[in-house]
Structures are given as structure tokens and as C-alpha cells.
């Protein structure tokens, strides 16, 4: 029969919280993509370059994360998964800023609701919020300890009413300044009362001279994703100037290593990307550039 001392020690051990998962691990354990959201429905499996982005978002020591992204890099799914983690693990006021109201409605209906509905850890996590007349509102939801608002940048007056700890902004280059101010700056001001705020901004650049995401990236540690050459092992960012092909035959495209000039075929790309690493070129704010050809 266990002694009182043994019982006490076991009780104290049971009170110790389990080690916190990295956000990338939590996403792969808890998030399920349903049919219609992904061509590969089922539990999320992150690409190697996505894992560090996720872990930066989940790192309490990092206030801002900026991603310069190509057209399709899985950022929306990553954003929704990170949002889900805050709902489940760190309840707080959350704001998602998108360019237009149509984007907001599409995001809620096509991504948030299906993913939350398909993921057992999130089922019924978001309740419908009611406006002053008692009607449910599509873009405002509450959950224990926090709330979620999805707001259009084209209506900056909506930002005045929300103080939030977590701010997600997608397609920032589609957000134009109004007579009042930049909607991005207005949204960031709504986080200033929270010392532990989190600001995540991502976009595909549109015009380099006026790009919101490139401006934010320039203020970050400017990380780039580098992969090893199968021939010489040197790390390089995969860039379009290093892609070559036979005249009139684009299907022969291959990558020429800038270090050893070896020409590497497409079949090596998955293993190269899997062995890749992010490298910071400046060490202040976490920022990732995924506009290369990975």
C-alpha cells in the first residue's frame, strides 16, 4: 500500500503540466483538412519550410512574423492552423485582417468553418456571436476566454472598436491606405495594450516600390530558405536566374548550382527541400521570404 509521502509525490507529479508542443507539432497532431479545403484531405503534414514559420508564430519570444510568399505556399492553411492553436491553447482577442469583405466571408466559410468542423480538438470551439439586434454575425465569433473578428481593410472604421492580442494579416499588398491611414497601421495600433502581442503579416508582393510586405520584411531578420546541392553540398536559395533549359524545351528545366555549376534535375527537388534550412541575414524580427522557386 503506498505511503502518504508517495501519494503526495505522485499528486504533485500529476499537477505538472505536460511539456508544451511546438506549434508545428500541434498542427500536425490536431488539425484535419476536410474535402474541399485541400487536395490532400486528412491530418495536416507540413512541408519542412513551413515548420519554422509555424514555430516562429508559436514562439512567445517573437512578436512579429513576416512572410513574403509566392501564389501557393499553404500560408492560408498555416494561418488558420495557428489561429486554431490560439483558440484552443491561448485564448485571446484575435483579429484577422483581409483586403475586402468578400475575402473575409470566403475565408470564414471556405477555411475556418470547415477546418474547425473537421478537427476534433476544435469542434464547436467557435460559437456564433450576435449583434445588437440578436442576429448571428458570420465574421464575429466568441470562444471561452477570447473572440475572433475577421475584418476588411477597406472598412478601417471597423478597426477602432477592437483591441486584440493576436493580429493576422493576409494579402497585405492588397490593402490600400485610405484618407484615415494605412489599415495595417490602424490594426497594429489595436494590439498596443498587450505586451505579449503577436503580429503575423503575409502577402505575395505586387509592386516592389509600394509593397507592404516587402516593407515589413525589410525590417525583419530577412530569412531565406536554402537547400543543399546534391553534388557539392553547398547551401543556396533556389532562384529563377539559376533555372536553365534547352532551347525551345522548357520541360528540360533544371537548376544550376551557383557554387559548382552542376545541373540538377527536378527529381532531386523534394529531397533538397526536405534538407533545407532557413538562414537569417539580419537578427531582429523573424521574417521569411518564400518567393523563390522551392
Region annotations inferred by a language model:
Residues 2-294:
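Phosphate/NTP-binding elements of NTP-utilizing enzymes
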Amino acid at each position: 500500500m503506498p505511503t502518504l509521502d508517495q501519494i503526495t509525490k505522485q499528486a504533485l507529479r500529476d499537477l505538472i503540466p505536460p511539456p508544451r508542443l511546438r506549434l508545428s507539432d500541434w498542427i500536425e497532431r490536431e488539425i484535419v483538412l476536410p474535402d474541399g479545403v485541400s487536395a490532400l484531405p486528412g491530418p495536416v503534414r507540413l512541408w519542412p519550410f513551413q515548420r519554422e514559420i509555424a514555430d516562429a508564430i508559436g514562439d512567445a519570444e517573437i512578436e512579429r512574423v513576416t512572410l513574403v510568399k509566392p501564389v501557393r505556399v499553404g500560408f492560408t492553411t498555416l494561418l488558420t492552423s495557428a489561429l486554431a492553436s490560439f483558440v484552443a491553447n491561448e485564448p485571446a482577442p484575435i483579429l484577422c485582417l483581409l483586403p475586402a469583405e468578400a475575402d473575409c466571408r470566403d475565408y470564414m466559410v471556405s477555411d475556418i468553418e470547415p477546418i474547425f468542423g473537421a478537427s476534433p480538438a476544435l469542434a464547436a470551439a467557435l460559437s456564433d456571436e450576435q449583434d445588437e439586434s440578436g442576429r448571428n454575425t458570420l465574421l464575429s465569433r466568441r470562444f471561452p476566454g477570447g473572440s475572433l473578428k475577421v475584418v476588411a481593410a477597406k472598412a478601417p472604421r471597423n478597426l477602432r472598436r477592437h483591441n486584440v492580442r493576436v493580429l493576422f494579416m493576409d494579402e497585405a499588398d492588397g490593402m490600400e491606405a485610405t484618407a484615415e491611414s494605412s489599415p495595417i497601421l490602424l490594426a497594429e495600433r489595436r494590439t498596443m495594450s498587450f505586451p505579449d502581442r503577436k503580429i503575423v503579416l503575409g502577402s505575395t508582393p505586387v509592386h516592389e516600390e509600394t509593397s507592404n510586405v516587402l516593407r515589413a520584411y525589410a525590417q525583419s531578420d530577412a530569412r531565406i530558405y536554402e537547400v543543399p546541392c546534391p553534388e557539392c553540398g553547398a547551401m543556396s536559395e533556389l532562384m529563377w536566374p539559376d533555372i536553365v533549359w534547352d532551347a525551345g524545351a522548357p520541360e528540360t528545366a533544371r537548376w544550376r548550382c551557383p557554387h559548382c555549376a552542376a545541373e540538377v534535375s527536378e527529381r532531386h527537388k523534394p529531397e533538397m527541400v526536405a534538407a533545407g534550412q532557413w538562414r537569417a541575414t539580419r537578427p531582429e524580427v523573424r521574417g521569411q521570404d518564400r518567393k523563390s522557386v522551392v
